[in-house]
Amino acid sequence: MSDLFYLQDSRSNVGSRAMFWREGGGYTSNLDEAEQFKRESAVKQYECRETDLPWPVDYVRARAEVGVDCQYLTRSEAEAYRNEDGRVYVAYAREWDGNDLVWRGGKGPTANLEDAIHPGAADAAGYLAQGFELWPCGYIVERSRPVVLAALLDHKQALRSVGLKLPKPKRPRSHRHSDRLNCDGCGRFLSDRQRFEDCPNCGARNAP
C-alpha cells in the first residue's frame, strides 16, 4: 500500500463526484489529474485549511468508477470516429451528473460507464428512435476518466486504514470581551450597546 494522499476540496462536489487538488493548480474530479501528496505535506495542508481533506490514494482508487465529461465530447468528432465494431453507448439526452453524461444501464440510469449498456449496430436505431443519444464505444472510452462518488468516501475509515490521526484544527482564541468597556462610575464591564445607555449597576452615563 502506498503512503500517498489526495487532497479533497470538501467545500463542494461536481454532481455526485468528489473534487481534488489538481496537479499544477485548480481542482478536478479526474483522479488521473489529481495531485498526490506525501503524508507530511497532506497533513500540513489540512492544518492550514481544514476543508482540504487528505485521502489515501489506494482507498479512493478502490472505490473509483468511470465517468465521461460532456465538455470533452463533440458530435463532429464522434461522427468522424472509425467505429469498427459498430457498438455504441446509449446516453440520456440533456441529463448529466455534474458534467458527466448519464447512460442507459442494465438496471436503469447510471453515470458509471462500466454499468452502461453498449448495443451493436442492429439495436442502435431503436434507441435513437426513443430519443437517446448514441456515442461510439471507442470514442467514449478514450475520453473517460476515473472519478469517485463523494458519498462512498468515509474519512474516519480511510484514515484508520493507514494509521493516520489528524491533529485537531487550531481555533482562534475567543475575544468576546474585546468590545467591552468599563463603566466610569463603578468599573463594571459594559457591552457595546450598554455604553450608550446609563450603567445598569450605578446609573452613570458612559456614552461618548
Name these PLM-found stretches.
Residues 2-29, 87-112:
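Short aromatic-glycine-(Arg/Gly/Cys) micro-motifs in beta-strand/loop hairpins
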Residues 193-207:
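Cysteine-rich micro-motifs
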Residues 90, 173-174, 197-201:
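Compositionally biased, non-globular sequence tracts
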Residues 182-188, 200-204:
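Short, cysteine/histidine-rich loop/knuckle motifs that typically chelate Zn2+
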